[in-house]
Amino acid sequence: MNRNRMIRVMIAAIATMAVVMGIIVGCGPEWGDGAADSGAARTAANGGTRNAVSVTLPSYYAKNMVFQRGKSITVKGAATATDGSNITGKQLTATIIQGESSDSATARIGKNGTFSCSIKAQKASLKPYSLMLSYNGSIVYQLSRVYVGDVFVAAGQSNMELNYTQYYSTKDVAYNFGNGLITERDLPRQLVDSNVHFVIADHVAGGTSADAKTGSKTSDDFPLVSAYNESSSWLSANNHDSRHLSYLAQQFAMQLRAKHPNVPIGIIQTAWGGTPISRHLRGGDIYANHIAPLRGFHVAGVLWYQGCNDAMRSAMAMEYETNMTALINQYRTVFGQEDLPFLYVQLARWPNYQYTQDVRFAQLRTLNNVGLRNTSNVGMTVSIDTDKGTSALIHPLGKDILGARMAAQYLAMTEDSDNDGASGNGSTGSKASRNIPSGPIISSARHAGSDGADNGSTNNRNGSSAGNGTNGNTDNGTIVLTFRNGTDNGLKAMKPNYSKTASATVPNYAKHPKATPLDGISHVATNTSQALQGFEVADGSGKWVSVNATIKGNQVVLSSANENLGGMTQVRYLWSGNPSCSSILYNKLGLPASPFIAVVD
């Protein structure tokens, strides 16, 4: 046995002996049950030793929790002396153990009793670790079963929160099933996987203390739903408990687990139905209670589906791009990573709010907003073709398709890939950023013959343009649309399948190791020879007329037998809350183009 291995064995042996002694003298919680329960937080007291302390960690530190692989493990909390003595400046030691291996870090107790330390990053493993804190050589807190894998925050409103317990087994069952439009048989396949663990934030409004860094009100702890408190642990995705978890998060996790079967998945669900984005931003109560308490806890990425409430009023829709940009920046700050993967869903078809298309466009423009501190690893999933014919429902079907598309984006962001579709965010800094699977994203609209060149930014609605050219020869009366580089490969017309036969399953990676989650999507759309639909143009009067659209290479050319397009100043595509076209634009990945509105140069 070499010297380094001998040292590791000795450390593990000493730690194990300390745990055993803690159990024997009754100075720690029962082994296997995590720390003793004390209200919302979990505490453990070393009641029989000199200078004994009681330690409290945040409520989401509990057995079955998942720490992020490849990143340092933050251990934070508060300590008080049980005999009232002053322990300011004293040290706690945090240790994580698996088998013969262990790593430790020390934390100095501050004046207010708080402490924080970081243990070095650990490898993903289906085998549990143990986490313990010691003071003066005695165990004062321990969790016997924690995991290291990939952790995601599932945030937003009801289409992210949507789960069986809250939405399909309640008094509103008729509303949620659309009075027979769907049945339980149509709901997404439930995830049953003991290596997926999750915790859900309870709906608690109002902040309770000031965040020193931001000045906004934040909660001291993370509120948890009753299902969590009953078990005092993160729930596992079994037949019973998966009913509480977001369907979209389940489908996303299902895809990642198939791709990486030796990596556990953790989900922290903070979504809250019926909420505007402002409540999720710094200064809002959801940010205060659900996001700020996670500061310093490392995650693999954020999953976001929200915007319906902001489509109710024009003012909210017009502010959405600014708010969405701020939210991405703020969440990345909380989790300590400037290029943290942030995956969000563009609003699905739904006819009932007037400004749905405006929010969709704001979501599109966020991808390349100059306010983003880092445009890498920001991905938008277009959902215009995923509802399986249930667009009359505010919670449409299709979460399996969305989960597969989001998983494909995440894997492209975090792994070396060689896919051909690509960047929805315009970044050219890294291979992963260039290869984020995306449908066609509008880059420029110009009159044929104009001497314009694409500068890679998205058109906006107030007169600025994606192209940097000027009006030129418009004699032929056609308009040429170009799409962002990489998203324009293999443009084609496809007919969306708005029926329940559309689906997404998990690819067989054993047989096809180079497959992606997109390969499991089937019957969502089929090739068609029918002309593209959904394109409209307008002149200065603001009158919109439909036009013909023809694919020519990696461009779309607009023309009209009845209208002279030379004087047209705007173009838009699928500009409706609930478009129902039978031939829409896709690329070679089978991903649909985002709806848009653009100024014509």
Where does each model-flagged region fall?
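Bacterial N-terminal signal peptides
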Residues: A12-I23
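Cell-envelope and extracellular/periplasmic
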Residues: D33-G34, G39-G456, G463, G467-D601
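Bacterial N-terminal signal peptides that target proteins for export
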Residues: N2-I14
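N-terminal Sec signal peptide cleavage junction
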Residues: C27-P29
